[in-house]
Amino acid sequence: MNIEHLSHWSGQLNREMYLNRYGHAGIPVVVFASSGGSHNEYYDFCMIDACAQFIEEGRVQFFTLSSVDSDSWLCNWKNPHDRAEMHRAYERYVIEEAIPFIKHKTGWFDPMMTTGCSMGAYHALNFFLQHPDVFNKVIALSGVYDARFFVGDFGGDEAIYQNSPSDYIWNQNDGWFIDRYRQAEIIVCTGLGAWEQDGLPSFYKLKEAFDHKNIPAWFAEWGHDVAHDWEWWRKQMPYFLGQMYL
């Protein structure tokens, strides 16, 4: 398997940003880390091994990104608005710097896939919903999609609202976005077992919104034995990759 350890300077974040590439061909899959995770996390927890068949066949290539969650949503000493603004800087990094970097490395100029587990699932779905021209496939595993989970009640703060998918999706009526959502492959999965309860309200709220707007998506509920843990994500990710058009 081709493995590359990469980095590039981010003017948006004013720091060196690290990312890894796993694979040599196929659609790029942009991976967001879980809470406090690094660009090495996906490999360290054997997610790359779990998806090795798809990688070695040249159907997908994974790009695992660095996170700034400790400076944004998880930075409890900052006020909620400043945490959202730091996330916005990260969004600009991903869209304006990381994605062009990946395009240059791969020669892939079509829309990409995005994925993540836990907090990475929040990022994956949020980035897809905000940028359906950049991403047209998403696999979100065990996420919480309500920004209140990170910052509490945010009132009318627009910067936070625009990054709370289970809220803003209800008011997304722009045909440009809706058309792209309807053409995409969307998988949102949760277990019903240990440590999954925090994500269930926003999971069901999202499902209701997608149904209301006639956006085709697979909201998959796995069993009461399925916990919020890597053991299950290693099973879910290759299963769902196998259901996608690659």
Question: What are the residue ranges of the model-derived segments?
Answer:
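Non-catalytic cap/lid and distal C-terminal segments of serine-dependent acyl enzymes
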Residues: 1-246
